Curated annotation (Swiss-Prot):
It is an enzyme of class 7 (translocase). The chain crosses the membrane at residues 20-42, 61-81, 94-113, 117-139, 148-168, 195-215, 225-245, 258-278, 285-304, 308-330, 351-371, 394-414, 436-456. This is NADH-ubiquinone oxidoreductase chain 4. One of its GO terms (cellular component) is mitochondrial membrane. The keyword Transport applies. It is found in: Mitochondrion membrane. The gene is MT-ND4.
C-alpha cells in the first residue's frame, strides 16, 4: 500500500517545484507510473483474500479493483484538464492538480482502510476537494447551487452513519473489518434496530445515488469541470457501492425484510432515469442520469445479497466507471469546440471528426452493454440473481435494459449523425492527447473481457 501512497504524496512537491513548461508532462508521467505500479495489487497470494501491508491498510478482492481504478484515473484526469486549464495562471493550475492528487490520496485510504471509522473519515474527506473543484472551476454560475446540493445531500446522509458506527463501537468494542463480519447486529428496541439498519446504509445510498436521493448528481455533473465529472462518475459513486458491500456483511438478518422498499426504488429508478435520458437535450445531463440508472442496478444487486448479485455489482461498478468517464471526456471534447452542451447545436460531427466518432460509437456501445464487454456481464449477473429472487423483477430490469439501449443510440445519433449546423464552420482538429485519453479508457474495458476474474470480488 505504501508503494502507492508515498509516490502519490511525492506528487505534491513535483507539482509545486517543476517549471511551468514541464508541469503537465511530469505530473502525468509520475501519476501514470503510479497507476502502472498499482496493477501489482491484482495478484492475491493469501488464503484469506486479505493482503495486509500494516494494521490500518489492507487490500482484498473487493477493494483491489476499485483501488486500481482510482489510480488509473488520476493521469487521465490530468490529461483531460490540460486544455481546459491552459488560460489559467500557473499557480491555479498547480492548485487544481494538487486537489486531484489529494482526492486520489483520500480515495486510496478509503478503499484500503481496515477500520470502518477510518473509512468513514476518508469517505467524508473526499467531499472537500470535489466541492472545491466544482465550485471553483465549474463552468456556469449555477455551480454554487450544485455545490450546495452536493454538500448537504452527502452530509445529511452520512451523519446518521456516524451515529450508527459509534453505537456499534460502543456495543462491540471494535470496528475492524476483520472481526465485524462475525458479530451480531445491535439488539435495540422495536424500532431501534430498524433505524440503525437504515442509518448504516443511508449515506451509501445517497452517494450511489439511489433514485429519490439522486438530485444532487445531475447538478454536480453538469456544473463540474471535466476532471470533476470523471472522478465523480468513475470512483466517487463507487464509494457508495463499496461501503454498502462492506456494511451488508454485518447487517444480517435485518436486511432480509427491510431491503424491499429500497430494491423496488432502485428498479423503478432504472426505468425513470432511462425515460428522463430519452428526453434530455443536455449532453452531460444525459450521461449523468444514465449513471443513476446503472447504479440503481448495482444497488439492487447488492441489496439482495447473493454471490451472483455481489459479483455482478462489482463488475458493473468497474465497467461503468470506465465507460461513463470516457463518455464525459468525449462530451468535453465536443464542448471545448462548440462551447455548448446542447446536443442539437453539435450535430453531424462524423463529417468533421471521423476518428472521434469511432470513440463515441465504442463508448456508447459500452454504455448500453454490448455482449462481450464486462458491462453486459455485470448486468446479466444482477438481472439473473434478481430473477431468482422474484420473477416480477424481470419486467422492470428488462424494460430498463431496453430503455438504456434506446438512449445510448439516441446519444450517438444526435451528436454524430444528421446535418451539420450552419454555425459550425471552423473547428479546431482533434489532438493526439484526446485520442490517447479515450484509448486509455477503452483499452481496460476491452482487456477485462479476457480476464474478468480480476474484478469478480469475493465470490469466485
Amino acid at each position: 500500500m505504501l508503494k502507492i501512497l508515498i509516490p502519490t504524496l511525492m506528487l505534491f512537491p513535483t507539482i509545486w517545484l517543476s517549471p511551468a513548461k514541464w508541469l503537465w508532462t511530469t505530473s502525468i508521467a509520475q501519476s501514470l507510473i503510479i497507476a502502472l505500479a498499482s496493477l501489482s495489487w491484482l495478484k492475491w497470494s493469501s488464503e484469506t483474500g486479505w493482503s495486509s501491508s500494516n494494521l490500518y491498510l489492507a487490500t482484498d478482492p473487493l477493494s483491489t479493483p476499485l483501488l486500481v481504478l482510482t489510480c488509473w484515473l488520476l493521469p487521465l484526469m490530468i490529461l483531460a484538464s490540460q486544455s481546459h486549464l491552459s488560460p489559467e495562471p500557473l499557480n491555479r493550475q498547480r492548485a487544481y492538480i494538487s486537489l486531484l492528487v489529494s482526492l486520489q490520496t483520500f480515495l486510496v485510504l478509503a478503499f484500503g482502510a481496515t477500520e470502518i471509522i477510518m473509512f468513514y473519515v476518508m469517505f467524508e474527506a473526499t467531499l472537500l476537494p470535489t466541492l472545491i473543484i466544482i465550485t471553483r472551476w465549474g463552468n456556469q454560475t449555477e455551480r454554487l447551487n450544485a455545490g450546495t446540493y452536493f454538500l448537504f445531500y452527502t452530509l445529511a446522509g452520512s451523519l446518521p452513519l456516524l451515529v450508527a458506527l459509534l453505537l456499534m463501537q460502543n456495543d462491540n468494542g471494535t470496528l475492524s473489518m476483520f472481526t465485524l463480519q462475525y458479530t451480531q447486529p445491535l439488539h435495540l428496541l422495536t424500532w431501534g434496530d430498524k433505524l440503525w439498519w437504515a442509518a448504516c446504509l443511508l449515506a451509501f445510498l445517497v452517494k450511489m445515488p439511489l433514485y429519490g436521493v439522486h438530485l444532487w448528481l445531475p447538478k454536480a455533473h453538469v456544473e463540474a469541470p471535466i476532471a470533476g465529472s470523471m472522478i465523480l462518475a468513475a470512483v466517487l459513486l463507487k464509494l457508495g457501492g463499496y461501503g454498502m458491500m462492506r456494511m451488508m456483511v454485518m447487517l444480517d438478518p435485518l436486511t432480509k425484510e427491510l431491503a424491499y422498499p429500497f430494491i423496488v426504488l432502485a428498479l423503478w429508478g432504472i426505468i425513470m432515469t432511462g425515460s428522463i435520458c430519452l428526453r434530455q437535450t443536455d449532453l452531460k445531463s444525459l450521461i449523468a442520469y444514465s449513471s443513476v440508472g446503472h447504479m440503481g442496478l448495482v444497488a439492487g444487486g447488492i441489496l439482495i445479497q447473493t454471490p451472483w448479485g455481489f459479483t455482478g455489482a462489482i463488475i458493473l461498478m468497474i465497467a461503468h466507471g470506465l465507460a461513463s468517464s470516457a463518455l464525459f471526456c468525449l462530451a468535453n471534447t465536443s464542448y471545448e469546440r462548440t462551447h455548448s452542451r446542447t446536443m442539437l447545436l453539435a450535430r453531424g460531427m462524423q463529417m468533421i471528426l471521423p476518428l472521434m466518432t469511432t470513440w463515441w460509437f465504442v463508448a456508447s456501445l459500452a454504455n448500453l452493454a454490448l455482449p462481450p464487454l464486462p458491462n453486459l456481464m455485470g448486468e446479466l449477473m444482477i438481472i439473473t440473481s434478481m430473477f431468482n429472487w422474484s420473477y416480477w423483477t424481470l419486467i422492470l430490469t428488462g424494460l430498463g435494459t431496453l430503455i438504456t439501449a434506446s438512449y445510448s443510440l439516441y446519444l450517438f445519433l444526435m451528436t454524430q449523425r444528421g446535418p451539420l449546423p450552419s454555425h459550425i464552420i471552423a473547428l479546431e482538429p482533434t489532438h493526439t492527447r484526446e485520442h490517447l485519453l479515450i484509448i486509455l479508457h477503452l483499452i481496460p474495458i476491452v482487456l477485462l473481457i479476457l480476464k474478468p476474474e480480476l474484478m469478480w470480488g469475493w465470490c469466485f
